[in-house]
Amino acid sequence: MILLIDSGNSRLKVGWLDNGAREPAAVAFDNLDPHALGDWLGTLSRKPTLALGVNVAGAERGEGIRAALAGHGCPVHWITSRPQLLGLRNGYTQPAQLGADRLVSLLGVRSRLAQTHPPFVLASFGTATTIDTVGPDNAFAGGLILPGPALMRSSLARGTANLPLADGPVVDFPVDTHQAIASGIAAAQAGAVVRQWLAACRHYGCAADIYVAGGGWPEVQQETERLLAQAAAIAGAPPLPAYLDRPVLDGLALLAAQPDPQSL
């Protein structure tokens, strides 16, 4: 059994590949809890022989994960960004600078597609929101990074004297502070998605598919789908965003299925 580890800024998500079979559902922990992974490993009836993962939570957290796995006799191999990964080309000026979770999640989306596929946009709404585009040629064209919905909200509350930690509906014309903040956050997130979708449509000359992921998606789903519908007047009917529960783990599973995953 090979463990699949997605170590993000807020959450640690774990899956596995066992004789070609995937986990029925990912296991998620608070990534600030140093004992959660080790405690969970102690409950397993079958011990993993290898862990394959990506870590964007820093070297200290990566070492904590390594130590927890080592305590159960399981080595970990961290996937890092590089110019090409299983045919997915990394268009970053400095390929190693691209977050490994972003590259692997794009690989996870591509693993679902036919060999010939339209361009696609993947928007992941976590602590940070990333919106990345891949062309029909399997080349990562580039992407955006912005604060995620929760980080936008908490930043306003922390960085200003009079703004609350808002909880309000998204409306066209907000008439109180909670509405104004909630609507502004949704507009910023949705507007960024639509911007990148339109850019992909123009660049490739055809409609791009849209995939979404992350815990922040429900908060911005309605606004994103509404703005995409409005954008249809410009670029043709937009696709309904397809939600993916764990694209990073999907990409790691594809890597784990290779003959020698530790060489990747």
Curated annotation (Swiss-Prot):
GO terms for molecular function: ATP binding; pantothenate kinase activity. GO terms for biological process: coenzyme A biosynthetic process. Its EC number is 2.7.1.33. GO terms for cellular component: cytoplasm. ATP binds at D6, S7, G8, N9, S10, R11, L12, K13, T127. It is found in: Cytoplasm. Its main location: cytoplasm. Its cofactor is NH4(+); K(+). Keywords: ATP-binding, Coenzyme A biosynthesis, Cytoplasm, Kinase, Nucleotide-binding, Potassium, Transferase. CDD domains: ASKHA_NBD_PanK-III. Substrate binds at Y92, G99, A100, D101, R102, T177. InterPro entries: ATPase_NBD, Type_III_PanK. Pathway: Cofactor biosynthesis; coenzyme A biosynthesis; CoA from (R)-pantothenate: step 1/5. It catalyses: (R)-pantothenate + ATP = (R)-4'-phosphopantothenate + ADP + H(+). A monovalent cation. Ammonium or potassium. The active site is at D101 (proton acceptor). Gene3D superfamilies: 3.30.420.40. Catalyzes the phosphorylation of pantothenate (Pan), the first step in CoA biosynthesis. HAMAP family: Pantothen_kinase_3. Homodimer. Belongs to the type III pantothenate kinase family. This is Type III pantothenate kinase. It comes from Bordetella petrii (strain ATCC BAA-461 / DSM 12804 / CCUG 43448).
